[in-house]
């Protein structure tokens, strides 16, 4: 059972540590959310840098504490940038976040996501359809991935329907999985928590 008071204290402690250390978390993200992602990182006390080139992604991993990889807008150069950044983080033992936006749109996106499996992200964040498709694509839960069910950034599944897929992903990566929605699901593969701080706009 989750101790909600202890959880709150842990969140406060984490925020205080971020503000005290001002960690660098690089981002390779889509063009739609560049400003929002950078400002969110700055708002909690971190330091942000948004890059595109392969060597820049690797450099940010080397000099920073983590990296965020959002697959929403894929440029041809990302075929090198994204896997190299993920590999650099994995090899350095640094956490990285995978946001598999639009999984199922085009062969490049699908192949990149398959390649990223070996680097085990510390956090996976996606809507219900993306999480279900990712677990299927990685062969972790249920039948083979039905990528036709993923409609860009929109979900065709409920958060609760993604529960088993989220747990399977978290157990494989050894990290955490967040299924976004009006009520968000968060799991480490053992414990499942529901957060009522989400938004229907995140579905």
Question: What do these predicted ranges mean?
Answer:
Residues 70, 78-127:
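Glycine/small-residue-rich loop that forms an oxyanion/phosphate-binding "nest" at active or ligand-binding sites
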Residues 66, 88-96, 132-144:
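Hydrophobic transmembrane alpha-helix bundles
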Residues 107-192:
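Conserved phosphate/ATP/ADP-binding segment of small-molecule kinases
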Residues 23, 40-43, 67-72, 95-101, ...:
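Short, basic, glycine/proline-bearing loop/turn elements
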């Amino acid at each position: 059972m989750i101790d909600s008071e202890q959880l709150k204290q842990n969140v406060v402690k984490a925020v205080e540590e971020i503000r005290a250390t001002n960690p660098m978390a690089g981002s390779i993200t889509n063009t739609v959310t560049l400003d929002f992602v950078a400002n969110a990182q700055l708002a909690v006390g971190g330091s942000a840098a948004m890059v595109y080139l392969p060597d820049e992604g690797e450099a940010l991993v080397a000099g920073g504490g983590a990296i965020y990889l959002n697959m929403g807008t894929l440029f041809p150069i990302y075929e090198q940038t994204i896997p190299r950044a993920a590999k650099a983080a994995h090899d350095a033992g640094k956490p990285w976040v995978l946001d598999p936006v639009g999984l199922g749109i085009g062969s490049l996106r699908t192949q990149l996501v398959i390649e990223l499996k070996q680097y085990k992200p510390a956090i996976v964040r996606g809507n219900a359809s993306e999480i279900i498709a990712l677990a299927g694509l990685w062969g972790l839960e249920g039948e083979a991935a039905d990528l036709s069910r993923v409609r860009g950034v929109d979900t065709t599944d409920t958060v609760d329907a993604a529960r088993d897929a989220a747990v399977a992903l978290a157990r494989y990566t050894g990290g955490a999985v967040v299924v976004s929605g009006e009520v968000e699901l968060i799991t480490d593969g053992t414990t499942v928590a529901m957060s009522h701080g989400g938004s229907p706009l995140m579905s």
